[in-house]
Curated annotation (Swiss-Prot):
Pfam families: 7TM_GPCR_Srd (PF10317). It comes from Caenorhabditis elegans. Its main location: membrane. This is Serpentine receptor class delta-25. The chain crosses the membrane at residues 5-25, 38-58, 88-108, 126-146, 176-196, 226-246, 258-278. It comes from the Eukaryota. One of its GO terms (cellular component) is membrane.
Length: 318
C-alpha cells in the first residue's frame, strides 16, 4: 500500500511539475529563447509520458538472476497483462528517450557556442528521428510478447497466484535489453556532460574581457548541465539495485521496490534545472527582477557569426 502511495505521489509530482515547466517554455520564454524552448518542451513532454506510464503500471521488478518477474499493481491491471507489458515497455522507452534528448540538448548548447542556432523545424525533425529507433525496438518486443508464467517462479518469489505477474523468456530478455540500453545511454549522457563542460570552460577563458553579466552565462550553463547530471545518476542507481538483485547481492524483498522508484526521480527532478537556473522562469515564479541583456532574436542558422567569437550572449538564457 505504501509503495503504491509513493509511486502515485512521485508520478503526480512528475506530471504536474513537467506540465508547469512546459507551460513556462511555451508561454513565458523570451523570443531569444524560442528555439531552446522547443528543446525544453520536448524534454518535459517525454517526462510527462514517462511519469504517466509509471503511474499506469506501478510495477515492481523482481529477479534472482535465473528469471525476471514484473509485478504491476497500477491501473493497467484492469486492462490485462498485455496492457501492463506495453506500459512497462513504454516507461523504459520514454526513460531512454529522455536521456537521448538530454544528450541532444547538450549538443544544442554546443552548436550555439559555435555560433549557430538550429531553427524550430530542424529541432522537431531531430526529435522525431532520434525517437524512431526506440519506438521500433519497443514495438518489436510488444508484438512478440507471449502470456507465459511459471508457478514455480511465483512460489520462489513468494508471490500470490492471484497477483498479476509478467514473466517468461520475453520478459527476461526484453528487460535485460532495455535496462542495458538505459545504462549505456546514461553513460553517454555523462560523456556529453563532460564534453560540454570543457567547451564552456574554454568559452569562459575567451570571455575574459567581456562585461560581467555576460561572464555569468558560463556559470549558469555549467549549473544547469551539472544539475542535469543528477538525472542519469538515478538511472545508474536503479540499474545498480537491479544488478545487485540479479547477482543475489541484495535480497529481492528489498530491491523490488527500489528500482522503479529510482527511475521515477529522473523525470521528477528534471524541470527544476530550468526553474532554478533560467532567469526568465525564476523571475516569473518568484517575481524577482533579473539583470539580463536585451538582445535581438537569432536566426535559424547564423553561419555569418564568427565561430570563434566569444561574444555570444544570446545563450545566456539557456
Amino acid at each position: 500500500m505504501f509503495y503504491q502511495l509513493l509511486h502515485s505521489v512521485l508520478s503526480l509530482v512528475g506530471i504536474l511539475s513537467n506540465a508547469f515547466m512546459m507551460y513556462l517554455a511555451l508561454k513565458k520564454s523570451p523570443k531569444i529563447m524560442r528555439s531552446y524552448s522547443v528543446v525544453i518542451t520536448i524534454k518535459t513532454g517525454t517526462d510527462i509520458l514517462a511519469s504517466s506510464m509509471s503511474f499506469f503500471v506501478m510495477q515492481r521488478i523482481i529477479t534472482d538472476g535465473s528469471s525476471i518477474v514484473v509485478n504491476p499493481t497500477g491501473p493497467c491491471t484492469s486492462f490485462g497483462k498485455s496492457a501492463c507489458y506495453a506500459g512497462h515497455m513504454f516507461m523504459l522507452c520514454f526513460l531512454e528517450y529522455d536521456l537521448v534528448w538530454l544528450i541532444t540538448s547538450y549538443l544544442f548548447r554546443y552548436t550555439i557556442l559555435r555560433g549557430r542556432e538550429l531553427c524550430i523545424k530542424k529541432l522537431v525533425r531531430i526529435a522525431f528521428y532520434v525517437f524512431i529507433p526506440s519506438m521500433v525496438h519497443m514495438g518489436v518486443w510488444i508484438s512478440i510478447y507471449i502470456l507465459t508464467e511459471s508457478e514455480s517462479v511465483l512460489k520462489g518469489f513468494g508471490i500470490e497466484t492471484d497477483d498479476m505477474i509478467l514473466s517468461g523468456e520475453i520478459i527476461y530478455w526484453s528487460s535485460i535489453t532495455l535496462l542495458t540500453q538505459l545504462f549505456i545511454t546514461a553513460c553517454l549522457a555523462v560523456v556529453a556532460y563532460t564534453f560540454i563542460r570543457k567547451s564552456l570552460s574554454k568559452f569562459a577563458r575567451k570571455m575574459s574581457v567581456i562585461k560581467t553579466n555576460e561572464k555569468n552565462l558560463r556559470n549558469r550553463l555549467v549549473k544547469v548541465a551539472t544539475f542535469k547530471l543528477i538525472l542519469p545518476s538515478f538511472i545508474f542507481l536503479g540499474i545498480t539495485v537491479f544488478v545487485a538483485m540479479f547477482t543475489r547481492l541484495l535480497d529481492y524483498q528489498y530491491g523490488q521496490y527500489i528500482v522503479s522508484v529510482c527511475f521515477m526521480f529522473s523525470p521528477v527532478c528534471s524541470p527544476y534545472a530550468y526553474i532554478i537556473f533560467v532567469p526568465h522562469y525564476r523571475k516569473f515564479i518568484f517575481g524577482r527582477k533579473e539583470n539580463v541583456p536585451k538582445l535581438e532574436q537569432g536566426q535559424c542558422e547564423t553561419p555569418e557569426s564568427p565561430r570563434n567569437t566569444p561574444n555570444l550572449p544570446y545563450i545566456y538564457y539557456i
